[in-house]
Amino acid sequence: MIQRLSHPSLLSLETLFKLCKSEIHLNQIHARIIRKGLEQDQNLISIFISSSSSSSSSLSYSSSVFERVPSPGTYLWNHLIKGYSNKFLFFETVSILMRMMRTGLARPDEYTFPLVMKVCSNNGQVRVGSSVHGLVLRIGFDKDVVVGTSFVDFYGKCKDLFSARKVFGEMPERNAVSWTALVVAYVKSGELEEAKSMFDLMPERNLGSWNALVDGLVKSGDLVNAKKLFDEMPKRDIISYTSMIDGYAKGGDMVSARDLFEEARGVDVRAWSALILGYAQNGQPNEAFKVFSEMCAKNVKPDEFIMVGLMSACSQMGCFELCEKVDSYLHQRMNKFSSHYVVPALIDMNAKCGHMDRAAKLFEEMPQRDLVSYCSMMEGMAIHGCGSEAIRLFEKMVDEGIVPDEVAFTVILKVCGQSRLVEEGLRYFELMRKKYSILASPDHYSCIVNLLSRTGKLKEAYELIKSMPFEAHASAWGSLLGGCSLHGNTEIAEVVARHLFELEPQSAGSYVLLSNIYAALDRWTDVAHLRDKMNENGITKICGRSWISR
């Protein structure tokens, strides 16, 4: 087709650009344009720039083509700015605007400023965005509805509600997009009452405004009102459904999440992702894999978030065979996913499923190891009885200049508990509070209680619970009761059990543990009394279950 292009029309060029598969093709088209003496045709060059701005290297090539035009007009400048703005390249976009102003040969117009504000808002560049706003006021484009809306959107995304409302109030003309931008601004700042008020005042609502308010209610945890608004929507799209699916999943209601997923039409990768992640996060790994299989059967290509959810499900199951299958699947397609998200999850999955050699290899190959990857390796080591190695890795992490946070200390304290390393655990507990000024959380205290309980230091564990600056949660008391069962201490066990009966009145676990302690001491009357109490309260022991991989 390139060879037959003797005198290209704009239409034939657009068709030709769509067929381009590589930068080599673009070079061939450009060479043909030069040979035909059409390099100064600004309409033609604008199409070339728009079509060749798909990657950073292509953008660089577009810029070189632009440079060959002696006096580019505003239309051509806008196409170049659009290419960089669509890639969210802040410095390059603003630099082109400044250069355009300096030349004096072309003036920015109502199409220029929204492109620049898009990249300013995405990068949170409040100062530069405000300066551009001042430029708009001087030039006189502030009355344009598209320009005004872009500033409402900008200030809203930067959480400057005063400026967003001020720009909106001064706009002589507003459309549905302008109103939606202000609704979104209030939603992003957590001002849901104000968002609802603006939504109610809208003369004409569009799908974006409905979706923004539904999503805001979902993210605030108000699923009841979110569903009520969702049901009132005159029209819904996959964004509407995905917000609700994600909300139900985060709230633990996977039945409602699945029902909405089945109801939605044209589900895309985001909806599949919300459902798979929901099952994984709610401890239903088999369902997560089942949905993934359904997705693959429909030829939907997974993104990195889906793969992270799948690996989380695999980690929960601890299934070596499934781990190998997921790892192999990713290994063949790694270039399609962001390693920033995928590799730490891949390390975590392999470590927790017992594939420590593979986890270690991935860990060592990381160009820059972070806190998440270190924690994944330490957890895996602890699960498989390598507590001392996990501690050495923690020390290596600190030596490399990575500062441990409260999650990292939770991990290392769990490591010490699982490996019964009392001195090390107590040392890290003090180090966390004194050197790193991290306030001990209920989870941190629970880890120490577990460590002391496992090693028979039951009185120390009990005294620690009583000295906590907050009410101990059930996991701390449960760890101590488990220690009492392990070491046969009835006196402390009875005190601990009473606390657990109050905290978790419908949990059979505490009754069963105390019953086992009595049984080990042949106190069958007490065993019978406990079972009668369970029956009176309608408490039943949940039968154990095993994972079976197919």
From Swiss-Prot:
PPR repeat residue numbers: 73-107, 109-143, 144-174, 175-205, 206-240, 241-267, 268-302, 303-333, 339-369, 370-404, 405-435, 441-475
GO biological process terms, semicolon-separated: RNA modification
UniProt-annotated stretches for the region Type E motif: 476-550
Entries under InterPro entries matching the protein: E_motif, Pentatricopeptide_rpt, PPR_At4g14850-like_plant, TPR-like_helical_dom_sf
Pfam families cross-referenced by the UniProt entry: E_motif, PPR, PPR_2
Acyltransferase as UniProt keyword: no
UniProt keywords, alphabetically: Repeat
GO MF assignments: RNA binding
NCBIfam families: PPR (TIGR00756)
Family the UniProt entry places it in: Belongs to the PPR family. PCMP-E subfamily.
Protein name as annotated: Putative pentatricopeptide repeat-containing protein At5g37570
